[in-house]
Each structure stands twice: as structure tokens, then as C-alpha cells.
């Protein structure tokens, strides 16, 4: 299995609406590891590690997010693989 890590920056109305909780839940549902973290500028940083196909599915989900959020844009970049335990909310 070819595993990788990708870092996402999600912009929009994504803080104070349960975005990190739902992101963590979706990541675990897909078997990914990583984290979701609020940034000072109002964006959310998401790190996801796992099989490329699952990360692609996760990216599609991030484009919409939960119903409580309004996602304006998602940027995506590959980063060095790091082993994470679970999918944390930071």
C-alpha cells in the first residue's frame, strides 16, 4: 500500500461551526490519520495521511465540509510522510 501525507488549508466560514470535529470523523471513517487545527487567520489546517485514493476522497469531502460550514477554497500540497496516531483535533 502506497501511503502519503497531504496538507490542506481550508478557507471560508470554517471556525466555530464544528468543522474540525466533522473533519476528524470523516478522516477516521476513511481510515486516515492526521489532524485538523484552527489557524489564527480563520482558516483550518488539515493534515491527512494514508492511501492516495482515500486522501482524494477526503479532499472531495473537504470541498463541501459539513452543512454548518461554508467552504470557499481548499489548497492542497504533498508533504513528507509522518506517522500519526488517529485523527486529532488540535
Curated annotation (Swiss-Prot):
PANTHER family: ACYLPHOSPHATASE. Disulfide bonds: none annotated. Gene3D superfamilies: 3.30.70.100. GO terms for molecular function: acylphosphatase activity. Keywords: Hydrolase. Residues 5-90 form the Acylphosphatase-like domain. It holds the Pfam family Acylphosphatase. The gene is acyP. Belongs to the acylphosphatase family. This is Acylphosphatase.
Amino acid at each position: 500500500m502506497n501511503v502519503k501525507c497531504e496538507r490542506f488549508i481550508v478557507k471560508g466560514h470554517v471556525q466555530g461551526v464544528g468543522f474540525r470535529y466533522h473533519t476528524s470523523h470523516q478522516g477516521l471513517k476513511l481510515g486516515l490519520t492526521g489532524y485538523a487545527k484552527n489557524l489564527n487567520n480563520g482558516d483550518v489546517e488539515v493534515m491527512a495521511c494514508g492511501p492516495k485514493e482515500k486522501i482524494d476522497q477526503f479532499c472531495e469531502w473537504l470541498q463541501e465540509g459539513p452543512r454548518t460550514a461554508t467552504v470557499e477554497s481548499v489548497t492542497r500540497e504533498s508533504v513528507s510522510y509522518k506517522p500519526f496516531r488517529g485523527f486529532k483535533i488540535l
